[in-house]
Amino acid sequence: MPKKTVANLTEADLAGKRVLVRVDFNVPMDKATGAISDDTRIRAALPTIEDLIKKGAKVILCSHMGRPDGQVKENLRLTPVAKRLSELLGQEVIMCPDCIGEGVTAAISQMSNGQVALLENLRFHGEEEANDPDFAKKLAANADLYVNDAFGTAHRAHASTEGVTHYLSPSVAGYLIEKELNYLQAAIETPQRPLAAIIGGSKVSSKIGVIETLLEKCDKLLIGGGMIFTFYKARGLSVGKSLVEEDKLELAKSLEAKAKEKGVEFLLPTDVVLADKFDKDAESQIVKVENIPDGWMGLDIGPESVKVFQEALSNCKSVLWNGPMGVFEFDKFAAGTDAIAHTLADLTATGTTTIIGGGDSVAAVEKVGVAEKMSHISTGGGASLELLEGKVLPGIAALDEA
């Protein structure tokens, strides 16, 4: 069901109103300097924040950072985020002493229309992740309505994503969540065809649900990353010291059989880059998958596989990518992932819809420097996967229907 969004709210709805906005400001911090090392998530929230400012709302932002487990941790305070956000907005952002309590109420009561305040880290209170109703009520007490723009936590029923919606009306989606839903749901429900899905990562177990769902939806399924060795072993091939999930061999067989039955083109790499140890400076060699020697482990897909994958993708109108092709953190084993990133960037330029489905593949396209060239980069890891699996996300379900 489509959800009501910020776009549905007029200046008359918002002027002078206190709007609680759940954002995802869980940004990476440089441990040595305490500075923000990547402000992508802060920038991603700007369209919603700027729209609310323009419409005269009093904007109260709330987010978590890290895993403080209900304790106040000085290194997880949101003060650096408030500073960076004020630079991006070109106006002061009031930093609140907590996320609930008298100090917060006092700070918000002083706000003028168009001002922005940031509450302190929600997870300094254990009640946030427990979705405690009293905590949710206190959080909602300083606001008139609610906007959720934190897609990365939409798959969690927390006080700030689900609990507060019981006390604030309307409760609507922000622009970032709206964009995520538009792209990800369209990708699996009404895609331009052929639709290819590229699934990577080290373990089959973490991607079972998404592979099973995609086998019902896509025309081509390309598998890369460490999980390929479980498929090879299931076929009876020797995989040396490569990562294998022994308890998933039957599942790998059944997924491959299901692809055949559904008429989905199922592609595994034909060659791999091997290493003698898991190390960035390991000895390496490229071999056909039938010739993996004992004592070696596969850490990337090989150049022949890249060509096969590129050929398979060349006529696709929609491509969804989740998970790297190899250990891209080691330059020696990043070629497969880099090549797929460049291939998708080139396809986007010719009109193909390319969606990077959260997690490590986002880091990969950013590392290669082609993030801007993709149609859509999802800000959610687990949330993206669950949405692609067809699961209901509590943070989305709790919002008002359009």
Curated annotation (Swiss-Prot):
Belongs to the phosphoglycerate kinase family. Gene3D superfamilies: Phosphoglycerate kinase, N-terminal domain. Keywords: ATP-binding, Cytoplasm, Glycolysis, Kinase, Nucleotide-binding, Transferase. It is an enzyme of class 2 (transferase). Substrate binds at residues 24-26, 41, 64-67, 123, 156. Pathway: Carbohydrate degradation; glycolysis; pyruvate from D-glyceraldehyde 3-phosphate: step 2/5. GO terms for cellular component: cytosol. It is found in: Cytoplasm. Monomer. Its EC number is 2.7.2.3. The gene is pgk. It comes from the Bacteria. One of its GO terms (biological process) is glycolytic process. The keyword Acyltransferase does not apply. GO terms for molecular function: ADP binding; ATP binding; phosphoglycerate kinase activity. It comes from Microcystis aeruginosa (strain NIES-843 / IAM M-2473). InterPro entries: Phosphoglycerate_kinase, Phosphoglycerate_kinase_CS, Phosphoglycerate_kinase_N, Phosphoglycerate_kinase_sf. Pfam families: PGK. It catalyses: (2R)-3-phosphoglycerate + ATP = (2R)-3-phospho-glyceroyl phosphate + ADP. The keyword Cytoplasm applies. This is Phosphoglycerate kinase. ATP binds at residues 207, 298, 329, 358-361. PROSITE patterns: PGLYCERATE_KINASE.
